[in-house]
Amino acid sequence: MGRGNSCGGGQSSLDYLFGGDAPAPKPVPAPRPAPTESNNGPAPPVTAVTATALTTATTSVEPAELNKQIPAGIKTPVNNYARAEGQNTGNFLTDRPSTKVHAAPGGGSSLDYLFTGGK
């Protein structure tokens, strides 16, 4: 199968992302309050809402804005802490095992069992 070809069955390989042929759910209208018949009763108390209360309740930080603040190559900010060995040791940037040389050239190797026949 070449690149860009269908995977068969007449369906996209990305149906798991887009939901396939499932119909979109219909929006449910919000319930309306029942009208009151008399206006002779006492008026409900008016609560004073400050501008800061409105902004703090409605202001939210978008996830995209948080992602822009994290440097490239770092998945989460909790991994960014000082290490005794230095910042570029271990799997700090790439999540790959270390490539640090552990033996002197010509010395012991973890692959000796392959080349010496286990002697």
From Swiss-Prot:
* UniProt keyword annotation of Transport present: no
Key words, A-Z = Cytoplasm, Cytoskeleton, Microtubule, Ubl conjugation
Q: Which GO BP terms, alphabetically?
A: anisotropic cell growth; cellular response to salt stress; cortical microtubule organization; unidimensional cell growth
Q: Which domain of life is it from?
A: Eukaryota
**Residue spans of biased composition, Pro residues class:** 24-34
Q: Which intervals of the chain are annotated as region Disordered?
A: 1-47, 85-105
- Quote the biased-composition stretches of kind Gly residues, using this chain's numbering: 1-11
Name any GO cellular component annotation: cortical microtubule, transverse to long axis
Q: Does the keyword Ubl conjugation apply?
A: yes
Which InterPro entries does its entry note?
Answer: SPR1/2/3/4/5
Q: Where in the cell is it found?
A: Cytoplasm, Cytoskeleton, Phragmoplast; Cytoplasm, Cytoskeleton, Spindle
- Similarity comment: family membership: Belongs to the SPIRAL1 family.
Function per UniProt: Required for directional control of cell elongation. Stabilizes growing ends of cortical microtubules and influences their dynamic properties. Acts redundantly with SP1Ls in maintaining the cortical microtubules organization essential for anisotropic cell growth. Plays a key role in salt stress-induced microtubules disassembly.
The protein in question is named: Protein SPIRAL1
Species whose genome carries this gene:
Arabidopsis thaliana
- Taxonomy-wise, where does this protein's organism fall, top ranks first? Eukaryota, Viridiplantae, Streptophyta, Embryophyta, Tracheophyta
